[in-house]
Each structure stands twice: as structure tokens, then as C-alpha cells.
């Protein structure tokens, strides 16, 4: 069960304590990065991508990390757990939150939600069983 206790108590702390991690290097990643900066004053968002996308890698708003096998679930999970451990050592009040930029990464993050939450990462996705059910068109239409 997810711990519902807020880890960031005041809106003014969001820009300092929330550390977003975006998986995937496409235009949606850039949108996440810019909107997180605009809305919360987050100076840099970590972006994990398999290729060097210059629009992102050269942006002052990103901490761009090339992870060639980012589409491999175990590589992604280990990378995220390492980042969470890095933040925990730096400041235990930091709240890492991960976002996927495509269906593949959203599914991977949902599937490992409990594992990543155990590492201290906020995973804003529904549990995998429900995600799997509602993203299969035939079953989705039956449910509707």
C-alpha cells in the first residue's frame, strides 16, 4: 500500500525538494522539464535517455544522462534506485518522482511501482494490473 503522508509539507518547498526524473528523450520530456520549471521553479530535471537529443541534452533545465539500455527494465530500475540512493545520501528530505514519456516506460514504471516506491521514488501511475487491463482495447471496451 502506498504511503499517503505528504513528503513535501509546503508548496514553497516543492522547487527545492522535488527532484523529477523523466525517462525518455522526446518532445514530451522537454515539455515536462519546462513545465516543472515554470510551475514549481525546479531548476533541473534528470532526463534518462538512450540517445543524445540535443534539444534536451544542451538545455540548462536538464541533468541529461545517457543510458543506452534505458528500455531494458532491469537497467532502468537499477538506474532509478541508484539515483534515489544518491538523493537519500545528499538530503533525506528530497523526493524523487519519475515520469515516463511513452507507453513502454509508463508500463515499466507501473510494473515496478512497489519496488521503486520501496527505494523512495514517487511513481504517479496506477498499479500494473489495472493499467494492463485498461490499455488493451478489447478489454477496455468490455469494461466500458
Question: Predicted segment positions?
Answer:
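A short, Lys/Arg-enriched amphipathic alpha-helix followed by its capping loop at the start of a domain
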Residues: 35-43
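Structural beta-sheet core signal
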Residues: 22, 46-47
Amino acid at each position: 500500500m502506498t504511503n499517503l503522508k505528504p513528503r513535501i509539507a509546503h508548496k514553497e518547498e516543492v522547487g527545492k525538494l522535488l527532484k523529477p526524473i523523466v525517462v525518455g528523450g522526446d518532445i514530451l520530456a522537454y515539455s515536462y522539464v519546462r513545465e516543472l520549471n515554470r510551475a514549481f521553479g525546479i531548476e533541473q530535471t534528470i532526463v534518462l535517455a538512450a540517445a543524445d537529443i540535443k534539444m534536451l541534452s544542451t538545455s540548462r533545465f536538464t541533468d541529461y544522462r545517457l543510458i543506452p539500455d534505458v528500455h531494458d527494465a532491469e537497467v532502468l530500475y537499477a538506474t532509478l534506485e541508484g539515483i534515489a540512493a544518491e538523493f537519500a545520501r545528499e538530503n533525506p528530505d528530497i523526493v524523487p518522482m519519475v515520469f515516463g514519456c511513452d507507453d513502454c516506460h509508463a508500463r515499466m514504471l507501473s510494473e515496478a511501482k512497489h519496488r521503486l516506491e520501496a527505494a523512495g521514488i514517487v511513481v504517479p501511475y496506477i498499479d500494473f494490473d489495472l493499467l494492463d487491463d485498461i490499455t488493451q482495447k478489447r478489454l477496455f471496451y468490455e469494461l466500458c
